[in-house]
Regions:
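Conserved kinase catalytic-core helix
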Residues: 108-148, 153
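Well-ordered, non-membrane alpha-helical segments in soluble/globular domains
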Residues: 59-68, 119-123, 172-178
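Protein kinase-like catalytic core scaffold
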Residues: 47, 78, 95, 154-157
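C-lobe/activation-segment region of protein kinase-like
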Residues: 150-251
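Catalytic phosphate/metal-binding cores of nucleic-acid and nucleotide-processing enzymes, i.e., regions
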Residues: 5-6, 18, 26-29, 36, ...
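Conserved structural core of kinase catalytic domains
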Residues: 76-122
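ATP-binding glycine-rich loop module of kinase domains
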Residues: 24-85, 109-111
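Juxta-kinase regulatory segment immediately upstream of eukaryotic protein kinase catalytic domains
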Residues: 2-29, 59-63
Length: 251
């Protein structure tokens, strides 16, 4: 029972009415709001509760349980699928998903991150991208939806993914692009643009993000005369720019 107002079993969290659901939400921690809805944290269950914007606008969402949970059987360590639906009087108003104690990549200072850990995380994520590709899942809008913590990457907001034949490279490209932007944009643009190989690799759709990370790290290490593990070890090469492409959560 959730505040004695809902039933919670299997794939459904069901509330009696809007008043009871709003009371339940008031007991959760607000996480953030996006184009699709608002997220809350249930610390008790270690769950993210995502409520569609349609609920707050008093409109029907139009989603079915089958659609929301369509990828939940693809077991992996990277993609955070919806695992339960939320209903009020048999109307779906949102879903739940496992909570991961991680930060959005765009809110992390790139200078402080361990490059070995980041590379390991990207390699593991690649395996899961291959897995979902083999299951005919087409990724969509992954940029700004990648979380990171201690050598692990997670990808959230998978609602707009589709069942469609797609190449592994096309699916991986979304992670590749954000990885490159995270490492370079508004910090090392001049360094990259002044190096022929890095300039050719940077943000090219056919370039693997992990390969760019390795090459970028090697080039920085050569310049500063030692093998760097964090970008702040090459801070002498930073030229901050206000003309950025990657929207970071700080500047």
């Amino acid at each position: 029972m959730c505040y004695n107002t809902c039933n919670y079993w299997g794939g459904i969290m069901e509330f009696k009415n809007r008043k009871h659901f709003d009371t339940y939400l008031n007991g959760l921690e607000f996480l953030g709001q996006g184009s699709q809805g608002t997220c809350y944290l249930s610390k008790k269950n270690n769950l993210v509760v995502k409520v569609f914007n349609d609920y707050f606008d008093n409109e029907e969402t139009g989603y079915t349980e089958e659609f929301l949970l369509r990828f939940s059987n693809i077991k992996n360590n990277t993609f955070i699928w919806p695992n339960n639906t939320i209903k009020i009087e048999n109307t779906i108003v949102g879903y739940t998903m496992p909570y991961k104690r991680a930060k959005n990549l765009c809110n992390i200072n790139p200078l402080s991150i361990n490059l070995d850990s980041l590379e390991r995380a990207a390699l593991n994520a690649e395996k899961d991208i291959k897995l979902v590709t083999d299951n005919s899942v087409k990724l969509y809008d992954a940029i700004y939806n990648i979380l990171y913590t201690n050598g692990k990457l997670y990808i959230i907001d998978t609602l707009e993914y589709r069942i469609r034949k797609v190449s592994y490279e096309e699916n991986r490209m979304m992670m590749d692009e954000e990885l490159m932007l995270f490492l370079v944009d508004s910090y090392f643009d001049d360094f990259v643009n002044n190096d022929k190989l890095l300039k050719e690799m940077y943000r090219k759709s056919e370039v693997r993000g992990v390969d760019f990370l390795k090459t970028f790290r090697n080039k920085l290490s050569e310049y500063v005369g030692k093998d760097i593990t964090k970008l702040n070890e090459a801070k002498c090469l930073i030229k901050k720019s206000s003309r950025y492409k990657y929207m970071r959560g700080f500047y």
